[in-house]
């Protein structure tokens, strides 16, 4: 395992798992903002992303609200690449693109602003589960004519059906829920 991610892996092993209408959902600072996320772990996440993807020539980082925001922000601060947040509410701007997302545990609309045709973007999110959020964000980006350079998540649930995503995704760590506990898969 990458030494920069060992602290993240240790903290994940402590994450409680809750049942959310039949979906086993783990609760961690990376994915939920609680418990508090150690700044050293957040910095290690940004470093891990920088080590795994080519950010040369990227114009914009794109992070879905809500839990992609802090990972996108940390990466933006580390790279000086601007960040756009795909919001869960509309501002009604003329160039706004609305898309519908369906995830393992719900559905909603997302709204993209601030990305233009020809922009080279990297999508940053917390976890790949069904892929519904990432696929919706990518559809919005393609609708405005952006070039998706890479998609990166901090975590990938290997026990989930990624059937909603049709694109390659880079992840820092693989995890699964087994017997009511979160495991890091090495």
UniProtKB/Swiss-Prot annotation:
InterPro entries: HGPRTase-like, PRibTrfase_dom, PRTase-like, Pur/Pyrimidine_PRTase. Keywords: Purine salvage, Transferase. One of its GO terms (biological process) is purine ribonucleoside salvage. It comes from the Archaea. Pfam families: Pribosyltran. Its EC number is 2.4.2.-. Signal peptide: none annotated. GO terms for molecular function: transferase activity. May catalyze a purine salvage reaction, the substrate is unknown. Belongs to the purine/pyrimidine phosphoribosyltransferase family. Archaeal HPRT subfamily. This is HGPRTase-like protein 3. It comes from Haloterrigena turkmenica (strain ATCC 51198 / DSM 5511 / JCM 9101 / NCIMB 13204 / VKM B-1734 / 4k) (Halococcus turkmenicus).
């Amino acid at each position: 395992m990458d030494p920069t991610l060992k602290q993240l892996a240790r903290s994940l092993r402590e994450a409680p798992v809750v049942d959310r209408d039949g979906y086993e959902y783990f609760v961690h600072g990376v994915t939920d903002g609680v418990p508090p996320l150690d700044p050293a772990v957040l910095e290690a996440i940004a470093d891990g992303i920088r080590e795994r993807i080519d950010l040369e020539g990227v114009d914009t980082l794109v992070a879905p609200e809500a839990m992609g925001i802090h990972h996108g922000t940390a990466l933006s601060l580390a790279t000086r690449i601007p960040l756009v947040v795909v919001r869960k509410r509309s501002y009604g701007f003329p160039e706004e693109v609305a898309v519908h997302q369906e995830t393992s545990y719900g559905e909603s609309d997302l709204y993209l602003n601030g990305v233009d045709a020809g922009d080279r973007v990297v999508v940053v999110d917390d976890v790949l589960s069904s892929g519904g959020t990432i696929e919706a964000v990518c559809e919005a980006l393609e609708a405005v004519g952006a070039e998706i350079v890479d998609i990166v998540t901090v975590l990938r649930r290997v026990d989930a059906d990624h059937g909603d995503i049709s694109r390659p995704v880079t992840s820092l760590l693989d995890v699964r829920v087994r017997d009511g506990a979160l495991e890091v898969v090495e």
